[in-house]
């Protein structure tokens, strides 16, 4: 959605190719309004930057921290490639970002993360590739491919801690392959 706002719907799934919701089919709506909190990621952004995975349950602030770390690293001189599949990190609209993501950040928005990572890697010469919510095998595969091409990674995943993460199939190859060297766990009170 515009400005990085996320809207979730629940109720009777409409199905079909277009998946249009009828107001009579809705049971609940969740509106998540993003915010920019500058400075929260600074302490995690020392150089050289180790590939880092940010963990928390849904709604824990992963995207907010990711956005600030991207900005901090980019303004600190690092070339960053940002895979913004759902348009919620940079909030790109008409060629302008709705959030400050740094001077040296190239954004690929509304493109599947796995494809965006490979395009950024081949075309934009990043030192760091950042993406939100690794959840599909294709996302994990893109992380592995990028990590073995000499770039650092910054990504998020839904998990309460590293142990919980390690129990999920999609992350096991990432952990075994030592794709990420550090995890930042956001504890929700």
Task: Provide a role label for each language-model segment.
Residues 1-49:
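P-loop NTP-binding catalytic core
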Residues 58-59:
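The conserved Walker
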Residues 74-118:
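P-loop NTPase switch/communication element
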Residues 36-40, 107-115, 134:
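A general structural motif
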Residues 62:
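Conserved lysine of the Walker
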Residues 65, 69:
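Hydrophobic positions on the alpha1 helix immediately C-terminal to the Walker A/P-loop
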Residues 54:
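Hydrophobic anchor at the beta1->P-loop junction of P-loop NTPases
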